[in-house]
A protein has these predicted regions:
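Structured mid-domain segments that build the active-site/substrate or prosthetic-cofactor binding neighborhood
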Residues: 257-260, 268, 384-483, 487, ...
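Feature activates predominantly on carbohydrate-active enzymes
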Residues: 41-45, 49, 90-322, 329, ...
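Short beta-strand-plus-loop segments that form exposed binding edges in beta-rich domains
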Residues: 706-713, 734-746
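Short, surface-exposed tryptophan/glycine-enriched loops
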Residues: 683-729, 757
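Catalytic domains of carbohydrate-active enzymes that cleave complex glycans
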Residues: 458-690, 749, 753-756
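Substrate-binding cleft/loops of secretory-pathway carbohydrate-active enzymes
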Residues: 338-370, 413-418, 445-452
């Protein structure tokens, strides 16, 4: 946030301002003449802060009730205008705010929906010494109580680096420090946010909306469209796949009937929003693609022509979007359309405007870095194309918002900071001309509070020293343990760049030999001892100990995942996993299965049954053994104890088929490798059987998959791909079948306890 002193009233900065003394005050707070919901919330914060700091209830008055009292003026009022010689916000930009003292009076004001709120927050933090580095889920803001409050004169004027900010989850802390998007009534209620938590835009739905407006099946879509089932009545509204078939995955934006129906439904939605609106905020309508289907929207001839016309895979979509927004601009100027620049096969690549066509300025493009290597910045060659496309978008429109990502799925449980990437990419986004940056961060423990704090500080001022924000956070959050906490944070930050495999956004499982190899046995052991010392230093300070152990949580989860290796290398230290588990506590339900599986593997013991005798003829260093992972997002068991299994446990096959199929696939080259189909005569139920899959050739992104109905049980093998070396192996798979479908009794189930690869040196 760019700040400077007002030199025009620098002569007023002499002498302390006594706000309260001996439980009394001579000050009144002057409310805005026409307070909004946000202003009422801001006033409440100001009153609470002054009460916590001084113990005094400051009286609140309106302009007509002001006499000659000393005063704190919040926002624009007749009193503030008279005192300051005119409307104080007239010269400000949107969201710019000023906090200043003039003689003994104080003025807190800003422009736009949240301007006054930002003025109050600045005053509480910088003049009253409020300490608050995390959201209220962890800790309430704190003031050092005083009997006499005298503050130095001040004058600050600030404007955020980014106009719009958003994290993956809302909170009072995030809202007060700049989270100003996607705060619908439902979200605010669901997160327990108070009255006065309001978005800049009225944006009822955020993302992945095309099927809300054109639902393929009855029961989907907005409430007023749930009786529609467009795929049955109008299959031509949906994209054509490469085989020439219409499929309900995306829309066919070149189709005139689709365009007409989609526009009608969008305008109906706008009408319904207006009917229920209680304010004058602009309306934001999201229109973008469905998430699961990652290929081109449509392969029909008309869409292909528009793809060439705009030199973008989504040419037909942009052609429709430009027509829609051109009409809206003339008929409903307060309506914005928000779309996403998402995936290179879809909308990430900006269109080339044909001769005479201009990209409308009522379109917001949320540019998503979903395909980046997320532990590397846009300065890295592997992510350079993402930044190049961002700059292309910024040349088309000033309304580009960058959507940056953290980790998903099981990866979210691991110690991972990614602060340098966040800081560098935010600065590069600002330099490219982005209007906003949002971070999809989830409310887990570990590094989340730190990341949200640094993100919000950088959103205020991208040029600020992000490392100093880390230090400030640690001092506030970890007290006497701050120095060691900061040391741990920097070591994780450095180590996380050294994984053996590039780190993607989604990690259904944690590969300690690949992207998460930086969580080595030695690193985990060293870091656990750091936390022992932090807890010793925090003895008697329950607040600090709580925060230290919240930071420790992700390390404890990683410790569970590597327990056998840790207990073997450090037997005197890692003696009882239940002590570690007891510290972890609550885990997000969607990721609790990972922790459950790891505990089961600990209980299985450090078992390793020998290979069959037929493998004795191979050199030991040419044989690799693995266990696949079931990454399905359901409540079914992913791992089961089995005393006869190679390692004492086995992975369940998600949604197994019959005949049972499994095989090898090169994901990066989209090439199917060897496969096997097992019929009843090939299966002996209730015992382990080894099947020779055949020869496979590894690539950087490849897998062995199970069940043609799912593939969600698989073994990713890109981590052992070696450039400039032989990557040919012979693969064997150990399976156990049970249940009626496979010739046994009871519920049908397929287990895999071991995949064996033998390196083939023959070319």
């Amino acid at each position: 946030m760019h700040s400077h002193l007002y030199t025009a009233y620098a002569d007023t900065l002499a002498g302390e301002i006594l706000l309260a003394d001996s439980a009394k005050t001579e000050y009144v707070i002057v409310r805005p003449d026409a307070p909004s919901k946000v202003d009422e919330y801001s006033l409440k914060l100001l009153l609470e802060g002054l009460k916590q700091k001084t113990g005094v209830d400051f009286p609140v008055v309106s302009s007509q009730d002001v006499n000659n009292q000393k005063r704190i003026c919040l926002g624009v009022s007749k009193t503030a205008v008279e005192d300051l010689g005119g409307n104080p916000i007239a010269e400000l930009q949107d969201q710019e705010f000023v906090t200043k003292s003039v003689a003994k009076n104080i003025y807190l004001y800003g422009k736009g929906l949240h301007g006054n709120l930002y003025g109050v927050v600045d005053f509480l933090d910088h003049s009253l010494g409020r300490q608050w580095c995390v959201d209220e889920y962890h800790e309430k803001p704190a003031f050092k109580r005083v009997e006499s409050l005298a503050i130095e004169p001040f004058a600050r004027r600030c404007i955020p680096s980014f106009a719009y900010r958003m994290l993956g989850f809302p909170s009072q802390f995030n809202y007060q420090y700049g989270y100003n998007m996607c705060l619908t009534d439902e979200i605010c209620k669901g997160w327990g946010l108070p009255e006065g938590t309001v978005s800049v835009f009225d944006n009822p739905v955020w993302v992945h909306t095309s099927f809300l407006y054109i639902p393929p099946d009855q029961g989907r879509g907005f409430d007023w469209l749930k009786d529609k089932g467009y795929f049955k009545s109008n299959p031509e509204f949906y994209g054509m796949n490469p085989l020439g078939q219409r499929v309900a995955e995306q829309l066919c934006y070149s189709n005139p009937g689709l365009r007409s129906e989609l526009t009608k439904n969008i305008l109906t939605h706008v009408h319904l929003i207006r009917r229920d609106k209680a304010d004058q905020r602009p309306i934001m309508i999201a229109l973008d693609q469905e998430d699961p289907a990652i290929g081109k929207f449509c392969h029909c001839d008309a869409c292909s022509v528009l793809e060439q016309h705009y030199q973008s895979p989504a040419g037909a979509f942009y052609d429709y979007l430009i027509a829609l927004c051109t009409d809206l601009k003339s008929s409903q100027a307060d309506v914005w359309i928000k779309t996403i620049g998402y995936r290179k096969t879809q909308t990430q690549i900006p269109p080339k405007m044909p001769e005479g066509v201009k990209f409308p300025n009522n379109i917001i493009v949320v540019y998503c870095s979903v395909e980046d290597v997320i532990n590397k910045t846009w300065q890295d060659p592997e992510n350079a194309e993402t930044y190049q496309n961002l700059r292309g978008w910024a040349k088309l429109t000033p309304h580009v918002w960058v959507w940056n990502y953290y980790l998903y799925s099981a990866g979210l449980l691991m110690p991972f900071s990614n602060m340098e990437r966040m800081a560098i990419d935010m600065r590069m986004a600002k330099a490219a001309g982005a209007e906003a940056v949002q971070l999809e961060l989830y409310p887990e423990d570990g590094f989340t509070p730190l990341l949200q704090y640094v993100y919000l500080k950088l959103s205020q001022d991208t040029d600020s020293d992000w490392k100093s924000h880390v230090r400030r956070f640690c001092e506030c959050q970890y007290g006497p343990s701050a120095a060691i906490a900061e040391k741990y944070i920097w070591e994780v930050e450095t180590a996380s760049k050294t994984g053996k495999k590039n780190m993607a956004i989604i990690h259904p499982s944690v590969d300690f030999e690949g992207a998460f190899s930086y969580l080595s046995v030695d690193n985990i052991a060293r870091w656990q001892k750091y936390f022992d010392e932090m807890n010793r230093l925090a003895e008697g300070d329950e607040r600090t100990k709580k925060n230290v152990n919240l930071l420790r949580k992700s390390l404890d989860i990683a410790t569970m995942g590597r327990w056998h290796g840790l207990a073997k290398a450090y037997p005197d230290y890692f003696t009882d996993y239940t002590l570690v588990k007891s510290r972890i506590g609550r885990v997000n339900l969607l990721r609790a299965a990972t922790l459950t599986d790891w505990e089961l593997k600990i209980q299985a013991g450090d078992v390793h049954k020998p290979l069959p005798a037929s493998f004795d003829k191979y050199p030991k260093d040419s044989i690799y053994e693995f266990v696949p992972v079931n990454s399905a997002n359901n409540a079914k068991a992913k791992t089961l104890l089995d005393p006869d299994a190679a390692f004492g446990y086995a992975t369940t096959i998600n949604n197994p088929d019959m005949p049972f199929q499994f095989g090898f696939h090169q994901n990066d080259t989209k090439t199917a490798g060897v496969g096997m189909t097992l019929r009843q005569q090939d299966i002996v139920p209730n015992q382990w059987n080894l099947y020779e899959l055949g020869e496979i050739e590894l690539t950087p992104n490849c897998m062995i998959w199970f069940s043609s109905k799912s593939w969600e049980t698989n073994l990713e093998l890109g981590g052992i791909f070696t450039p400039d070396s032989a990557n040919r192996f012979r693969a064997y798979v150990s399976l156990k079948f049970s249940g009626k479908e496979y010739g046994g009794d009871g519920e049908s189930m397929v287990l895999c306890d071991r995949i064996i690869l033998v390196k083939d040196e023959l070319k």
